[in-house]
From Swiss-Prot:
GO terms for biological process: ascospore wall assembly; chitin biosynthetic process; protein localization to bud neck. Belongs to the chitin synthase family. Class IV subfamily. Residues 1-170, 355-452, 911-1029, 1077-1165 are cytoplasmic. Residues 19-53, 74-97 are annotated as: Disordered. Glycosylated. It is found in: Cell membrane; Bud neck; Cytoplasmic vesicle membrane. It catalyses: [(1->4)-N-acetyl-beta-D-glucosaminyl](n) + UDP-N-acetyl-alpha-D-glucosamine = [(1->4)-N-acetyl-beta-D-glucosaminyl](n+1) + UDP + H(+). Residues 192-340, 474-891, 1051-1055 are extracellular. GO terms for molecular function: chitin synthase activity. This is Chitin synthase 3. The lineage of its organism: Eukaryota, Fungi, Dikarya, Ascomycota, Saccharomycotina. There is a cross-link at residue 136 (Glycyl lysine isopeptide (Lys-Gly) (interchain with G-Cter in ubiquitin)). One of its GO terms (cellular component) is chitosome. Its EC number is 2.4.1.16.
Amino acid sequence: MTGLNGDDPDDYYLNLNQDEESLLRSRHSVGSGAPHRQGSLVRPERSRLNNPDNPHFYYAQKTQEQMNHLDVLPSSTGVNPNATRRSGSLRSKGSVRSKFSGRETDSYLLQDMNTTDKKASVKISDEGVAEDEFDKDGDVDNFEESSTQPINKSIKPLRKETNDTLSFWQMYCYFITFWAPAPILAFCGMPKKERQMAWREKVALISVILYIGAIVAFLTFGFTKTVCSSSKLRLKNNEVSTEFVVINGKAYELDTSSRSGIQDVEVDSDTLYGPWSDAGKDASFLFQNVNGNCHNLITPKSNSSIPHDDDNNLAWYFPCKLKNQDGSSKPNFTVENYAGWNCHTSKEDRDAFYGLKSKADVYFTWDGIKNSSRNLIVYNGDVLDLDLLDWLEKDDVDYPVVFDDLKTSNLQGYDLSLVLSNGHERKIARCLSEIIKVGEVDSKTVGCIASDVVLYVSLVFILSVVIIKFIIACYFRWTVARKQGAYIVDNKTMDKHTNDIEDWSNNIQTKAPLKEVDPHLRPKKYSKKSLGHKRASTFDLLKKHSSKMFQFNESVIDLDTSMSSSLQSSGSYRGMTTMTTQNAWKLSNENKAVHSRNPSTLLPTSSMFWNKATSSPVPGSSLIQSLDSTIIHPDIVQQPPLDFMPYGFPLIHTICFVTCYSEDEEGLRTTLDSLSTTDYPNSHKLLMVVCDGLIKGSGNDKTTPEIALGMMDDFVTPPDEVKPYSYVAVASGSKRHNMAKIYAGFYKYDDSTIPPENQQRVPIITIVKCGTPAEQGAAKPGNRGKRDSQIILMSFLEKITFDERMTQLEFQLLKNIWQITGLMADFYETVLMVDADTKVFPDALTHMVAEMVKDPLIMGLCGETKIANKAQSWVTAIQVFEYYISHHQAKAFESVFGSVTCLPGCFSMYRIKSPKGSDGYWVPVLANPDIVERYSDNVTNTLHKKNLLLLGEDRFLSSLMLKTFPKRKQVFVPKAACKTIAPDKFKVLLSQRRRWINSTVHNLFELVLIRDLCGTFCFSMQFVIGIELIGTMVLPLAICFTIYVIIFAIVSKPTPVITLVLLAIILGLPGLIVVITATRWSYLWWMCVYICALPIWNFVLPSYAYWKFDDFSWGDTRTIAGGNKKAQDENEGEFDHSKIKMRTWREFEREDILNRKEESDSFVA
């Protein structure tokens, strides 16, 4: 939704018509009414919100489900999933202002949904929903009723019913594998139909790769030979070697060694023989073309000594002499041995000569013709030497006068094909072509020209992509990167920062420079006895901590005087909008209202940072607006005042989300230490660790949850009293029901890894997926995968955003966040996703958050991942440059266009919701139903979906974000850095890259279908992604072609110069990027190591990955105690949804309040 001034931050992405400005101005309020558009720029078939393939299908469904308490305005493009707003249905893509007691409430205010007389609503917005269908008159079509039916959210529905009709792709899979019927596959270890189909799809995909490879190979090597099929060798004039002699412009092979003592050129059945002295010369006069086109043009004189007959047929025209091929020989009429010696006029010699096949054609270039010392002309492509007319036996023959005229007319270098055009002149020209031809003009056929066109067009495209990527990557490094993050720096300072990161990344144990923490902000030491004391009231807690932490007086700050100059009327601070600034603005207005009624009363400003930590400030309110304030931990990290901006931008609350599986204590400690000690204020960050099952990693003496809980202290609830709660897992069958425990407390440092003076008091929540009682005896109870861990958080954020019913686990998560931070979960705006073996640089989180705050269009970003064990083995050494170039060339290029296609799961940040303008409207991003529903899809019945969802879930999330929000940005921030341990064994690397390569292929296929990415046609990200997809699929063939070209260039002639230059540019520009962007010359060495390993990167790894298309395991990447045993079939059993309780958080809270009241009453009694 646009702001009050009609300025939409997304407008520059939209194709607006001339009337759009007035439309925008008319849509900024609830009462603006339904928009009227004159037309749609989106094709109708792409705007049907009842189509499950529409990127915003689930968003439209969600708004329909929640129409009783959500009110959503149209977007700036007039998008509206249900235009019949007056009948009670909602409008999509916008925001509303919540109504309660005649005042506007907070954004995402979670009010009682069961109250019928007072409607609670949520401010929410989205700019991504496709546009409605409009008829020719501009009227809005009604949304189809089939799409307005609510979805039963107690169970996430399967998105599509099974269809027995075979698709074209399935038919092709069966066709290409007709030779492998089901019984044979079952005999080979694939008894299940789904497994067999995966194998068939793998074979079909490999066949497609082979087709593409064959096309590329044909264009590279076969196309030229097909359309430019000149099988004969071409030799340039004066460069004919001594193994040949030239006869009438053609080169014939001369054998100089078989017959000793030979004195002249002799012709046998298929070979010319002659002495060494004749090699490399012009022997045209030894085999003269007589009595052809020159018959009756060249005639014998009456006293001619040349044998002739009555029909003017002559035996020869010129003396039968050899001459130099460069034309330097002078006429020689001396008779040797006898007249006609060496003229080869016998029938046997002539028949033998006519039977010879020339080995090559002699050619002249136009420059050579014009600049030659010889009198050369051209006729119909033949090069004629007029100087050879001086060799005519003038005493014995008569010839046309035109011969002398041509010779003396200074026609050198001209093409006389059109001049000699009438009948007699053409006969003369053909006669000259027979007797004085010395070669052909260097020319090409139409096929050869077409071949050159294809070659150079391909060359231009490839070089354009490579060079443009290089230039843009350099531009990003010099111009964009230094302006990103918390502060703008010059290139010198940027280099220093990069060097500091390089020094830090040389070893995983190397410590980063940490700031000393104020003693009041350090962790407190508690005895077990002190953990059970009674919670203080919210106001007492605020009063207790307000001055101690930030050294400001206990007196209440009046926002009307202290922030009025900075905080705009819409809740924006210097153009930057956050939940905190908007909440502060609203509470400031409430202060004004309350103070005007009772000057002695003023709402405590500090409460603005607690969101709904107190009951409604409006007297008489009976609605539950927040959780019970008495359960808040007494020593939570106090929220700073609104004007606390240590980095020059409003702070936003961030969840640092860590997923772990089988990591050891050192790896997990490394990650949590680095996150806890980042210089981003601990008041605005929350650590959240998810342990994926009761897993004991290989070599560990404790399970992963035990290790994680050992790093917590000062628990909200004693660990032995925490109960497991149910939730809907991303799985099939009985495993769809899972249980987890939630522990909340504060991070417990190890003084040996982080000195006490550098420790911050950071809240932490650990979620342990423990599984149902039925699976406690299994190998990996509770394990559902990393995607399920992410969905726990994402689904929770969606439920909070849309005020939906939630599971018990999600309510406990909400409750624990409230207890440990004093904040409702809707205050969090970003999520930093980190793997449990990653160490983050201290200022990384600050730079990432700063970029999010400064540009609300950014929905995701990543930093640079460094390898900490560079020289551990040859396996790690070959990865160093690959990591570097993937960031500083690929991601840098994509970042300039806001379309980074892969945000690595080990270190990336996503936006939960984004401010839409500065007037209180928000766009759910990571919490968007279209993201959550598609990412939590549990129906993986095709090879494509299995590779997307089971192997490359992190990359798929990035693709899903771009697919849902193609006009928003995903960027790369090199100022933010982390380091990790790369695989040091080849089998582990092989397993890791198998997953990465296969997920890359399938994700690129998803992205190449997105038509709304930046650019158009060849100048678009869609085209670049298409090129990357083809390039990835033909990597094994490409490296084979490269090796072939290099070997061919070494051993054969002519040298393929263009191909070698192209190869040098492709391999050389990354090296040049290192020289330009890197601050360490050592990367040149790592580049050399990488180039030597190209056969591994481009052949071994992708070939292995393609052959393992149907392998969906994680292989040797993560190992557990006892080995990676196969779990039971994921589809085993049925899902009993009755075991999962779904309620609103208010209903859960009301139940909790009653339970606590009963316990209190029973205790008193």
